Amino acid sequence: MRRLAFLVAVLTGALVFTSWAAGADKSKLEMYTATVDRATVGELVREGFDIAATREVAGGVSVDLVLSARARDRLSAQGVGLALKRNKDGLTVQEQAAAQAANGFTVYRSWDEPGGIRDELYEIAKKNPSFVKLEVIGHSVQGREIVALKVTKNANQLADGARPDVFYMATIHAREWISTEVNRRLLHHFVDNYKKDPVVTNLVDTRELWFVPVSNPDGYQYTFDVERLWRKNLRDNNGDGQTAIGDGVDLNRNYDEKWNYDNEGSSTEFASDTYRGPSAASEPETKAIQDLLKRLRFRFMVTYHSYGPLLLYMWGFQVQTPTADDPIYVAMSGTDANPAIPGFDPGVGADLYITNGTTDDYAHAVTNTLGWTPELEEGCVGCGFVFPDDEALVQAEFQKNLPFALDVAKSAPNPAQPVSHLGNTTKPFYLDLSAIDPEKVHNPLSDFRFAVSYGDPQPVQVLARRSLGAVTLKYQINGGPVQSGPTSEWNGGERFGDLGDVYYRIMRGSVTGTSPGDIVKVWFEGGGSASDPFTYTARVESSNRVLVLAAEDYTGISPVYKKTDGPNYLSYYVDALAANGISADVYDVDANARTAPSLLGVLSHYDAVIWYTGDDVLTRDPGMVAGTASRLANDEILAVRAYLNEGGRLLRTGKYAGLGEADGYEFNLETNAPCNPDDMGQDGCEPLQNDFMQYYLGAYVYNDDAGTTANGKLYDVVGTDTPFDSLAWSFGGPSANNQDHSASFIATSGILPASTYPQFRSWASAKYDRPGGPFDPHTGSFYAYSNIADITYKRLTRTINVPAGGANLSFWVSHDTEELWDHVFVEAHTVGQDDWTTLPDQNGHTSTSTGDSCPEGWRELHPFLDHYQTLNADNTCSPTGTTGSWNAASGNSGGWVQWSVDLSAYAGRQVEVSIAYVSDWSVQGLGTFVDDIVVSTGEGTTSFEAGTDGWTATGPPPGSGPNSNNFVRTTAGGFPEGAAITTEDTIYFGFGLEGIATPSARNAVMGRAMGYLLR
């Protein structure tokens, strides 16, 4: 995904997006279109908006969304230009649906109606007992049957799974009626043509074909009865006994594979149409399909969806991550130039957008079932999910998909050597999958060739058909005798994990006995077959543990360097390493024909890599225009990502390092030719993804120029945590003196808590020393910090004894919240009484404005707020509630401000006081910081230096869900914004180390970094 949109005036001016309310929004859903940039698409996905389809158009990306009226209004208020999606007759999607229903359906039938889909499945089984078996594999939330049909000769007598088997399923998303029809017609194609068509007859006699045309029967029926555009199942998320927007689980995010891997591929929010559910496989519909998959372990699966047109395959959890079985997927799916389903775009699912907990990923990873998701067409321009109720159009869509569906059945006996009506075949060995799919070029998971080697022994690898058995490495050095070596299967590394290596596997061996200058020819043999060869040159063979990856792009154009015959800043790195007793090798990208270092040939030989970028703003070749990048930028990311996956350690540094990923610059994936960002659909442009930055480098948000002063210089930096604690440095002086830009980052663990997402653990290890910084403690070293999280009600609470003469509470607060939506306030009640109210700040920092969250229904999240606010019949809000009144602050406080609260109303009594911070459904500022609390009686006075003096994080009141995090006592190191972010294996600087002012300071920073990375 792209940049998280924070409301932080001092750090970033990014656009902010907000998703819709949970709970009782009963407005009809409708479809809209908007043209946005690539970064905005990522924001929409992250915020859980229901994105139906995307298309590359002039000026950006056209996005189709399904929105409630409330969601539409909120998104429009954030500056996204929405237009109702209409067909050629000017009808909206809901109007089209209403017209279909009013006229009576010709094609479509519901689940429950007499003669509906359920009855039809029973009738098919009843009429064809010799080759059709019906099985109820589970029941839905509301008790409807989930019906599967097994089609094979002697179906009722033959044990399940006795023949090569294939699974066709549909309607996991309720509104996708065309998927139901295509699956139903495919079922009829086999049933109705058995003993009539020789191809069908042979398949039914020799294969086992399973069908579940409706895997979400509750949702499917609901689309007929209530809401045509409903997507999820009918789980009652808030337990109010009603079905409304905010209910339901996205069943295609509920499977027990990478479930809750992150908050991008699925959502934790009820209201999101990608809500993943309370736990993996929590839904009975999911359990039914999972149990079937585990029991039968199909050879193949096809799960029909709409709308695209797309033909997606594994994986969904991480971008540009093909499986080891990719030769099968490519052979059967085809390519952009020649797809297996005419007009469809085949490819890896995550390259559309990240998903996790999906049916296909579960099937492949857990049950060794290779799976596809055809995203069927919409039927007409502007029809969206309401495919026309037109027999000819529906049948045409089925016929278009039939050849691929038949290929899947035909290929079941030997998946490793599939049948394709395109004539595609697979080979025993692959060194380079880009030969069959240009989109796989230079990906370390699919392109294993390299030109130079930096070590001996030199690992080499090949993708080999598993049935070949033992694979032998063959190589020649300088044309000498052929030498042989064993190979072993690669385990996938630390992060990639399961390679999906059911029928193919990556085999590795080692070439030994080379010297610098040698030319080595490599190939592999096994099972009577041999791979193509490739040749590399041995260049470097040292015992150095560190590689300096010089990626200055001095032969590029952004900027144009004065010195273009070699690196400008390399000496600063080599010298700083030498000062710490470390010798290093160098890989100069420009000098290597602008080629990224190979994982195997170069990076694998080192324990740590220093990747620096000098003055490079964006890696861009001559002839490329603004808004675009060289494919080299993506190649470098993929190479370093693969290196980290195998246990490597990295320091990334540069004044613009990561800007291209953060801003989503486009590049040509296939040919590295210039591409036009305003016409991406015609020239192969793809965006640089920031997933590497977020999930490998621990930097969830890139804050552009956040460490730069008004006069263009950089603030000093102070170390706050491992490995830079107690270290400080400045810029300029006797250095490269080139630091005129900077970045800070929000640590990924500040957004995805390490307690839940330990794989992304990260922290701010150094910060810019901004004078009067609004997010450092007001005094001393400690303060209370709210942390960052949506849908939370956080309280810092203490009981105070108020004397007869009254008392006063004062404290300093610095807050940055989503303006008008998230609020900071002081609430109080007499101990033992329900007289709750909020108290105004006598210094004028609070107001009675209820903001935008109250009329948008945030009481559904936090019903306790009814004590202070009232939602009126006209959808306005009053700042009084059942027991008290509303006084709060929102937005950015502009730094530390002092609040003063009068407690005289509680004279002679005990009062429980809470400093509270409440957030809505989505979008976070940087949170709330509290320091230097003073109570006039002395009771509860604290600056948090030695403790909290009785102030505790008490959690939310009744009615709100549990907080994902709470107020904590911490140093500035507990706030996740930093000039440097550190993970277990990486350090990421928002500046170039070459610009640190003095050699001694550079040496100290380098020493700390290397001490950590080489530990």
Please provide the spans of the model-predicted regions:
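Glycan-association/targeting regions that enable binding to alpha-glucans and other polysaccharides
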Residues: 412-549, 556-584, 795-802, 808-810, ...
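Extracellular carbohydrate recognition
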Residues: 821-823, 894, 919-937, 999-1003
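A glycine-rich, often tryptophan-bearing local segment used as a flexible ligand/cofactor-contacting loop or short
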Residues: 616-746
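Extracellular beta-strand-rich recognition modules
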Residues: 807-815, 824, 910-919, 944
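Extracellular glycan-recognition surfaces and repeat-rich motifs
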Residues: 490, 726-794, 819, 837-897, ...
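Extracellular ligand-binding/catalytic regions of CAZymes and related secreted enzymes
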Residues: 288, 395-413, 528-530, 540-545, ...
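Helical hinge/lid and interdomain linker segments adjacent to catalytic or ligand-binding clefts
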Residues: 156, 491, 561-672, 908
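Metallocarboxypeptidase
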Residues: 224-226, 230-432, 706
